[in-house]
Regions:
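Composition-driven detection of intrinsically disordered, low-complexity segments
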Residues: 239, 484-485
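Short, contiguous strand/loop micro-motifs
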Residues: 157, 175, 275, 424-425
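A short glycine-threonine-serine/GTX helix/turn-capping micro-motif
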Residues: 269-276
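N-terminal targeting and processing segments of secreted/endomembrane and organelle-targeted proteins
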Residues: 120, 488-489
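Intrinsically disordered, low-complexity Ser/Thr/Pro/Gly-rich interaction regions
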Residues: 278-439, 455-475, 481-483
Length: 489
């Protein structure tokens, strides 16, 4: 049996009763987190533009666009919700099983799969248990493919959330549609030819578009396959197939016979983001916040801040002096400066107005990111970070964190996840809605229908924001705005 066939065989045969209770528990947390960051992201300019695009296209089959009163055909709802889920770079990240993997992180696994499952799940009127099963299956396929693909894929410039995310999404949708094994094979073949997404677009609106297109591609490919559309039946392993063309190969031992054995959510796990910024900044972000609070530090006390990491981190956190909030998400100097000045690093901190503040710009100039030889030698399975703060009085304060809160080694509690959800959801829906969503996800497996959840994820609060006049204004603003991207140093 070839690999493509093996993936399709797993998806077609796995049932809800096969899923370990611990995986169900973990999945509920990832889903709650994914819905929260998507609600927050639904208010972002990039989401407003996509929402306007979806509204203009129209269509008869209606599925909810989160945080709004807008509905759309399933592929376009998946697009809009996928963009929203990644708009703030606040969605979860997949760990690697190898110390040699780039960054030790691979994809943002939840957003493409969740956006696709939510849209098609509403369309097909599935139960909460069916929702959970499809999500878990999609994430498992996505994570195993991402873990096995040659690291050259990401190193050469592909964004794996965009490319691999679609393959997870299409299998999740295929599970909802109850596609047979031979149809799932074709669905993979179709979706693999749709895969794209380039890292040069990091720091722009196109990065979240990658996640949205992955979700949309998954829905479209599954529906086409269901209708009889043909594709290669060995698309993953073929010489001119996905792994070889996109990466020059893959490690078969990391995927063959590994689907659900154990589930990737269990080992090595998925990390939930404590901050709305690039994952590689999070151990340092955690550390600087703890040091600042423990020593009651203020900007006026600090002569310099030195941040040491492995050599891969500067290749992703590429903005030494960001000009926009999008760029600030990939900037160690901003992450350090805002933590010192505000002792927080939440949604309210990653906004354009903060990035441009004189006091922030001044403090960013005192931050240096360097490659630490000791941390480099330890490998890339964790984003180990060391901080050295030199004070004007001659004192030096140092610390090191290997992982941040939300990592499987430092997991967030349900209460912490609920608090993050409320922070995110508060941008888009009333507090009562947020509370209902938390309750519904906690008992998701018992839901006979998704209707109560869908209703709670949209609101009258968003209606005013989603008016055609305001969306048109957002579109016009974007046409006039020039993205002044800083190049790699």
């Amino acid at each position: 049996m070839g690999l493509t066939q093996e993936v399709a065989n797993y998806v077609s045969k796995v049932s809800y009763k096969d899923i370990p209770s611990e995986v169900i528990r973990l999945a509920r947390g990832f889903i709650l987190d994914g819905l929260g960051v998507a609600l927050a992201g639904s208010t972002d300019d990039c989401s407003r533009i996509v929402q306007a695009h979806v509204r203009q296209i129209g269509g008869k089959q209606k599925c909810a666009v989160l945080g709004t009163t807008l509905s759309a055909p399933a592929p376009k709802a998946a697009l809009a919700n996928g963009v929203a889920g990644h708009a703030m770079d606040y969605d979860d990240t997949q760990l690697s099983t190898s110390k040699k993997a780039v960054y030790g992180l691979l994809t943002h696994p939840t957003t493409p799969v969740l956006a696709a499952v939510l849209a098609v799940g509403e369309r097909q009127k599935i139960t909460g248990a069916e929702f959970l099963l499809a999500y878990i299956v999609g994430v498992e396929v996505e994570c195993r493919i991402a873990d096995s693909i040659n690291p050259r894929h990401y190193q050469s410039g592909f964004h794996s959330t965009a490319t691999v995310g679609g393959l997870g999404a299409v299998m999740a949708v295929g599970k909802i549609l109850r596609l047979k094994e031979n149809v799932l094979v074709r669905a993979l073949g179709i979706c693999a030819s749709m895969a794209s997404g380039l890292r040069e677009n990091f720091g722009t609106m196109t990065k979240p578009l990658h996640a949205g297109r992955a979700a949309e591609n998954g829905v479209t490919a599954a529906l086409l396959a269901q209708s009889g559309f043909t594709a290669a039946t060995n698309i993953l392993e073929a010489q001119r197939g996905f792994f070889q063309v996109m990466a020059g190969g893959y490690d078969e031992s990391k995927i063959a016979g590994r689907l659900g054995r154990p589930y990737f959510m269990q080992e090595p796990g998925i990390s939930i983001k404590p901050y709305p910024s690039g994952s590689l900044s999070h151990p340092a972000q955690d550390l600087i916040l703890d040091l600042v609070k423990a020593h009651d530090l203020h900007a006026s006390d600090i002569e310099s801040i030195e941040v040491g990491t492995n050599s891969n981190v500067p290749n992703a956190l590429i903005y030494p002096m960001p000009k926009t909030a999008l760029e600030a998400k990939f900037s160690i100097p901003f992450c350090m400066a805002i933590a010192v000045l505000e002792r927080k690093a939440g949604i309210a901190q990653f906004v354009d107005s903060k990035v441009r503040q004189k006091r922030v710009v001044e403090l960013m100039k005192r931050v240096t990111l360097y490659v630490d030889d000791e941390l480099e030698a330890l490998g890339f399975d964790q984003v180990r970070s060391r901080i050295r703060i030199k004070l004007h009085n001659g004192r030096t304060i140092e610390g090191r964190y290997d992982v941040a809160r939300g990592h499987p080694e430092r997991p967030m509690s349900w209460t912490e996840l609920a608090d993050k959800f409320k922070e995110c959801a508060g941008l888009a829906v009333p507090a009562d809605n947020a509370g209902r969503v938390i309750d519904l996800i906690a008992r998701l497996a018992q839901l006979k229908t998704l209707n109560p959840l869908i209703r709670a994820l949209g609101s009258s609060k968003a209606r005013k924001k989603s008016s055609p006049r305001l969306i048109h204004a957002s579109l016009q603003h974007t046409k006039e705005h020039k993205w002044n991207r800083t190049r790699k140093p």
